[in-house]
Every structure is written in structure tokens, then in C-alpha cells.
């Protein structure tokens, strides 16, 4: 073997000794990428429906609800009344003459009815009526009578 041929062999060996680490890294990256590609095709291959647009195409119209709050007692009774309106906001009326009533109409799917009253006589009552049906009624007979009516879902 001549020196020239032996010199080429040594230079290739020197070249491989310098670039073997980058070559191993390149092979590991290629093999790792292929493994991830294959595993991804097994475990995440189903196409799921997007729920980004959840608007219903057609909503059925419904009749508005009518809610009536009533507070009653002996003639001349004055009461302090608290209630939730159609938007569930608390309202208060001080010194209301009885009988007292309030009619609310709403298109909400559900409404919570809450009515509280305290009068200056020994008897007071309340009633919540939803679409003509009495859903809650209570009468209290005591000194400075206090009563409440509650409908969780009207």
C-alpha cells in the first residue's frame, strides 16, 4: 500500500471520528420522529367534532310564563315585602297596604320565586301563582306575623 492510499484511509477515519456524534444525533432524531408519527396515527387518529359553535339551529318558541306574587291579611294590615323579580334581583317594598299583588311575565326557561312578608297584625299570608296554578302558599298567625313562600323552579 502506498502512502497516498494510506493517507486517504486515515483522513476518512479522522473525518468519521469528528462527525460520528452529530450522525448519531441525526439518526436518533429521525428514528424518534418516525416513532412519534406511527404512535400518533394509532392513538390520535379519530377526528372529533368541534364544539366551537354550539348555537342550536332552531329553538322552539314557548309561551311566556306569568308569575303572580300575592300577600294578604286582615283589612288595614301594613307589611314590609321582599321578593325576587323575574331576573332574580332582590326587591323590597316597605309599608305596603294589604292585599298586595304583583304580576310578572318572563320568557326565561326557569325562574326562582321567593316572597317574604312581615305585617303589623297577627295574621299574614303569601301565595305564588305560576301560569294560573298555585305553586306555594303559606299563612302565619302570630304576633307581628312573618311569612314566606318559595318556588325553586317556576
Curated annotation (Swiss-Prot):
Matches recorded under Pfam families: Mycobact_memb
Gene3D superfamilies referenced in this protein's UniProt entry, alphabetically: MmpS1-5, C-terminal soluble domain (2.60.40.2880)
Topological relation to the membrane, as annotated: Multi-pass membrane protein
Subcellular location field: Cell membrane
Family membership: Belongs to the MmpS family.
Primary site of residence: membrane
UniProt name for this protein: Probable transport accessory protein MmpS4
Keywords from the named record: Cell membrane, Membrane, Transmembrane, Transmembrane helix
Transmembrane segments: 19-39, 97-117
Gene Ontology cellular component terms for the protein in this record: plasma membrane
Keyword Transmembrane included in the entry's annotation: yes
Amino acid at each position: 500500500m502506498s502512502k497516498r492510499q494510506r493517507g486517504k484511509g486515515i483522513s476518512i477515519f479522522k473525518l468519521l471520528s469528528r462527525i460520528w456524534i452529530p450522525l448519531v444525533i441525526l439518526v436518533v432524531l429521525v428514528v424518534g420522529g418516525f416513532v412519534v408519527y406511527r404512535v400518533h396515527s394509532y392513538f390520535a387518529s379519530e377526528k372529533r367534532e368541534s364544539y366551537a359553535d354550539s348555537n342550536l339551529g332552531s329553538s322552539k318558541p314557548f309561551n311566556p310564563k306569568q308569575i303572580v306574587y300575592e300577600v294578604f291579611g286582615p283589612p288595614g294590615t301594613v307589611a314590609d315585602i321582599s321578593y325576587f323579580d323575574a331576573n332574580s334581583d332582590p326587591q323590597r317594598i316597605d309599608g305596603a297596604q294589604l292585599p298586595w299583588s304583583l304580576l310578572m311575565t318572563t320568557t326565561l326557561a326557569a325562574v326562582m320565586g321567593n316572597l317574604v312578608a312581615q305585617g303589623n297584625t297577627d295574621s299574614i299570608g303569601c301565595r305564588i301563582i305560576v301560569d294560573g296554578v298555585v305553586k306555594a302558599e303559606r299563612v302565619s298567625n302570630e304576633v307581628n306575623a312573618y311569612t314566606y313562600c318559595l318556588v325553586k323552579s317556576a
